[in-house]
Amino acid sequence: GIEKIISRSMFDQMLKHRNNPACPAKGFYTYDAFLAAAKSFPSFGTTGSTDVRKRELAAFLGQTSHETTGGWPSAPDGPYAWGYCFLKERNPSSNYCAPSPRYPCAPGKSYYGRGPLQLSWNYNYGPCGEALRVNLLGNPDLVATDRVLSFKTALWFWMTPQAPKPSCHDVLTGRWQPSAADTAAGRLPGYGVLTNLLNGGLECGKGPNPQVADRLGFFRRYCGLLGVGTGNNLDCYNQRPFG
């Protein structure tokens, strides 16, 4: 299991300031909840060589730390020690409700970002809830109140391919082979493609930007703590977003 790679003390070192009094999520993201959620996704962090497993865990925690960061450039212990500080999206610009016959929004509910990967939009809450057997369309706040479920939503997004896109898990474990179109678009296996999968439309193919650099900073720190190389193709500065 993943606890062989990430012990409780390692989790606490990686997410060093998550329980800081200044963090709105203090007390929410626990090691036990992380392990409990991972049991529902048994291939997460357990596929391939030890290095591949370490890299997947560093990548998951790196991307989720960026999504929930409370860091700033001169923060104590550096900006990359402040992952998992936030639970809900700050100042959501809308209720993230798109017209959808299959995943209609519930009256009065808002599908702004919640949890480690900041699950957003009714068309993500819907299928995620179906997969986890919870009515997340009707109860989106469960992602911000149920610790284990919150981690499960992040792991669901990480592990589940959304065709024609691969899953983050398949990219990291080598199951994804880029097509000719992927290669032409600069999408090669590595951490950069994960950023493309998670937020490519806003962050990729635009040259260097602070969001991608922040995602990378967390990943580098966590790879260092786990004693594993980062691999290649780390950013998506020159990748076209997935369609």
Curated annotation (Swiss-Prot):
Record's GO cellular component terms: vacuole
Gene3D superfamilies: 1.10.530.10, Endochitinase, domain 2
InterPro entries listed in its UniProt record: Glyco_hydro_19, Glyco_hydro_19_cat, Lysozyme-like_dom_sf
Record-level GO BP terms: cell wall macromolecule catabolic process; chitin catabolic process; defense response to fungus; polysaccharide catabolic process
Sequence similarity: Belongs to the glycosyl hydrolase 19 family. Chitinase class I subfamily.
Organism superkingdom: Eukaryota
Classification via SUPFAM superfamilies: Lysozyme-like
Enzyme type, top EC level: hydrolase
GO MF annotations in UniProt: chitin binding; endochitinase activity
Catalytic activity: Random endo-hydrolysis of N-acetyl-beta-D-glucosaminide (1->4)-beta-linkages in chitin and chitodextrins
Protein name, UniProt field: Endochitinase
PROSITE patterns: CHITINASE_19_1, CHITINASE_19_2
Disulfide bond residue pairs: C23-C85, C97-C105, C223-C236
Catalytic residues, chain numbering: E67 (proton donor)
Record's keyword terms, sorted: Carbohydrate metabolism, Chitin degradation, Chitin-binding, Disulfide bond, Glycosidase, Hydrolase, Plant defense, Polysaccharide degradation, Vacuole
Subcellular location: Vacuole
Species, as recorded: Carica papaya (Papaya)
Pfam families: Glyco_hydro_19
The protein's Enzyme Commission number: 3.2.1.14
Function recorded in the entry: Defense against chitin-containing fungal pathogens. Shows activity on chitin, tetra-N-acetylglucosamine and chitosan.
